[in-house]
Regions:
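N-terminal active-site wall of soluble small-molecule enzyme domains
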Residues: 48-93, 104-105
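Short, acidic/polar
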Residues: 13-26, 76-86, 129-130, 205-212
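Glycine-rich, proline-tolerant flexible connector loops at the mouths of alpha/beta enzymes
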Residues: 31-54
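Catalytic beta/alpha-barrel core
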Residues: 36-38, 44, 68-71, 92-103, ...
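Catalytic domains of carbohydrate-active enzymes, especially glycoside hydrolases
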Residues: 17-39, 88-94
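C-terminal functional modules
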Residues: 252-362
Length: 362
């Protein structure tokens, strides 16, 4: 099951604000938390107690909290890979190792008596995960997560992201990646030019970022990296169908009520005899074969257009299609709507027999 997550940074906020954010995110179905203990400089006991209080609140709401720990903090706290009791006492679900060990240590850590998950960095493109696997870890407790990148243009290229993600998915591991909120104002560091894993996501709406990660079929958990996302963003992301590809669309004023019903309410799947020009969803032409589909808005067809054949197309009338290429319109096809420009690229991820749907963009 795919999941949604948020991030909190207790060293840059307050316990009260973090708890409010957790409660709000829980309302919209989020159940994973990324947080990091960057340092224990200053009042060590106070920092740890505040972490415990925040994590306890998260746990009560059903969140799974993974704590990113820097090597420096490992040393400051005297933590050994042989003894992870500190994180168990914090109430953490697991720990994230941004910088790893030799492979043997990670393997040993997966056998910790508390069942803590050991999350390793997916973004480096080395044989790191292969090395850990050669040391026979407890695979149930080993998961992966990409980095996020605050510096503009420093995020992962798509090809590198796919290569790295496949390394982990080939082992059947649970995976995660980060998306960025437009409304959030901070992360763990002073630079705040967005906190995404993929560079191409930096200027995209948050829901589109999430749809893309899920569409790759290589990412299980999508986490908002910066804090705090707005309630509107959380609500929109929480409403997302995580298992089925959906597209934000606009409909034209000329579109009839029946055509709106076909687009928005009927179930759709990508017919198996694939065309390079269109994605066909044919059940509506069967269900509504006795209805009238008068010609209207029969302009030339562009990639990303939503189409319904009119009565001039005989037995095809009522069939819904998505244009994959620009096409000549002979007057037999009504152009009823269009996928929003920033999501047209997601068409490349639909495969034969995939189920899909549409959401009317307000």
């Amino acid at each position: 099951m795919r999941r949604l997550g948020i991030s909190i940074y207790p060293e840059h906020s307050t316990v009260e604000k973090d708890k409010e954010y957790l409660t709000l995110a829980s309302k919209y179905g989020f159940n994973r938390v990324f947080t990091c203990l960057l340092s224990v400089d200053g009042e060590k006991e106070k920092i740890i107690e505040e972490f415990k209080e925040t994590i306890s609140h998260a746990n009560a709401l059903g969140f799974q909290v993974l704590v990113d720990i820097s090597p420096a903090v490992f040393e400051q706290l005297g933590i050994s890979y042989n003894d992870l009791s500190f994180f168990h006492e914090l109430g953490a679900y697991g720990i994230r190792l941004d910088v790893g060990f030799s492979g043997l240590e990670e393997s040993i850590m997966t056998y910790n008596p508390y069942g803590l998950k050991i999350e390793i960095n997916m973004s480096n493109g080395t044989k790191y995960v292969d090395n850990i696997m050669s040391h026979r870890p407890n695979r149930e407790n080993l998961i992966g997560c990409h980095n996020f990148y605050p510096h503009r243009y420093s995020g992962l290229s798509y090809d590198h992201f796919i290569t790295c993600s496949k390394q982990f998915k080939d082992y059947g591991m649970r995976t995660a990646a980060f998306i960025s909120s437009f409304d959030a104002t901070y992360g763990p560091w002073p630079v705040t030019e967005g906190l995404c894993t993929l560079e191409q996501h930096r200027e995209l709406p948050m829901t589109t970022q999430a749809k893309h990660l899920f569409a790759t079929e290589l990412i299980d958990d999508v986490i908002i990296a910066n804090a705090y996302a707005s309630e509107e963003e959380l609500q929109a992301l929480g409403a997302l169908n995580k298992e089925k590809q959906t597209f934000d669309i606009g409909l034209y004023d000329t579109t009839t009520e029946l055509e709106r019903i076909i687009v928005l309410d009927e179930p759709h799947f990508y017919r198996g005899d694939v065309s390079e020009y269109m994605i066909r969803s044919t059940q509506s032409r069967v269900k509504y074969k006795k209805e009238e589909f008068k010609p209207h808005n029969t302009r030339e067809i562009k990639r990303g257009d939503l189409l319904i054949d009119n009565e001039q197309y005989g037995q095809y009338k009522g069939e819904l299609q998505i244009a994959l290429k620009d096409m000549v319109n002979t007057g037999k096809t009504n152009v009823v709507g269009r996928i929003v420009e920033e999501e047209i690229f997601l068409l490349d991820y639909l495969q034969a027999w995939d189920k899909f749907g549409f959401t009317l963009k307000k």
